[in-house]
Amino acid sequence: MKNIDEQIKIIKKGAEEIIDAKELKEKLIKAEKENTQLVVKLGLDPSAPDIHLGHAVVLRKLKQLQDLGHKIVIIIGDFTGMIGDPTGKSKTRKQLSSQQVMKNAETYEKQIFKILDRNKTDLRFNSQWLEKLNFKEVIELASKYTVARMLEREDFKKRFKNQQSIGIHEFFYPLMQAYDSMAIKADIEFGGTDQRFNLLMGRTLQAEYGEEKQIAIFMPLLEGIDGKEKMSKSLGNYIGIEESAKDMYVKVMQIPDSLIIKYFELCTDMHPDAIDIIRKQLNEDKVNPRDIKMKLAKEIVCLYHNEAEALNAEIYFKNLFQDKEIPEDIPIFKVRSENNLIEAIVKINSNTSKSEARRLIAQGGVKLNGRKVIDFNDIILKSNDVIQIGKKKIVKLLVE
């Protein structure tokens, strides 16, 4: 196991906030002295089973701690998932059935172990302890927190102010998530910055029950390839961890230069010192950002595929955008038969308006099957048509 200072450097890499950094060092010193592992927790709500790089930010951090010799515990919220995490929601979420939750959990499990070592990961379901609580114990748990404190939470506060309903069961979500920390005696819990309330609740509850408080480590939310909104499947700006090596490589190359370092920090296992060198090179204009981005794309593809596939993806990219070739196996994009070219462009580029799409065409920035589009009014889109928008965005259509 690495020395304490080196461990802290790795743990801090890319982290937005650590509560409390001093306590973290004390826990690491104690673990080293007693030759024990720290219990590192991540809770997952299995309501959205497909994992993209934004979700993987925390999983990659867990892998780093796993490699440092600590115990990783993944808690699948099969019990809490039937409520659904209300974080950031403007209304009560529809409850999932236990069958839906378990089906999603199976998909999660398959994807999690593309990142974590299955043999060194403790996978738990919180129904194992939450289902066993009797009503007396639930009342005792509820007594540890007040409604006033719950309403300090931003999403609840907004809904209360706007006279939108808040189910009492929704107040139990952060309490149950906090109880998970007690059940496994968590030393550290990871989450996104949007999970702040839930993670700090874990610290509060542990203290209420006389246990040692967990360290809460918050990872930043990752912007999608558009560089504007957080990565989201619904916004179409995501990179799925199960995408092909070629699609993954091409998508990484689409991120703005301003996000290169952030992606290195959050999406790769590159050592912080190596990232500092790249940061310095970029700041001093000693390298072409495009070359560094290609290095980033290769690093990411290697993590989810292998070096050979990453090399093939790089060749594919060079053929596509440097030698102006259009390979057959490009990403497929679904459009409806009634969509015209303008509507298709807006769908493909989620942040492009119809007027911007028309301007792109007028500027010669759109190609259909290798030819610049001049008059789009009479174009009828067909399956297997290839649309190229700008220099990097290229898709093959599937018309439904």
From Swiss-Prot:
One cellular component (GO) term of this entry: cytosol
Keyword Transferase: no
GO terms classed as biological process: tyrosyl-tRNA aminoacylation
Molecular function terms from GO: ATP binding; RNA binding; tyrosine-tRNA ligase activity
Gene3D superfamilies: HUPs, RNA-binding S4 domain, Tyrosyl-Transfer RNA Synthetase
Role summary: Catalyzes the attachment of tyrosine to tRNA(Tyr) in a two-step reaction: tyrosine is first activated by ATP to form Tyr-AMP and then transferred to the acceptor end of tRNA(Tyr).
Residues bound to ATP: 233
Pfam family, one: SYY_C-terminal
Extent of motif 'KMSKS' region: 230-234
Assigned EC number: 6.1.1.1
Motif 'HIGH' region: where in chain: 46-55
Protein origin, superkingdom: Bacteria
Keyword Transmembrane in record: no
Protein name, per record: Tyrosine--tRNA ligase 2
Keywords: Aminoacyl-tRNA synthetase, ATP-binding, Cytoplasm, Ligase, Nucleotide-binding, Protein biosynthesis, RNA-binding
Reactions catalysed, as given in the entry: tRNA(Tyr) + L-tyrosine + ATP = L-tyrosyl-tRNA(Tyr) + AMP + diphosphate + H(+)
Oligomer status and interactors: Homodimer.
Enzyme class, broadest EC rank: ligase
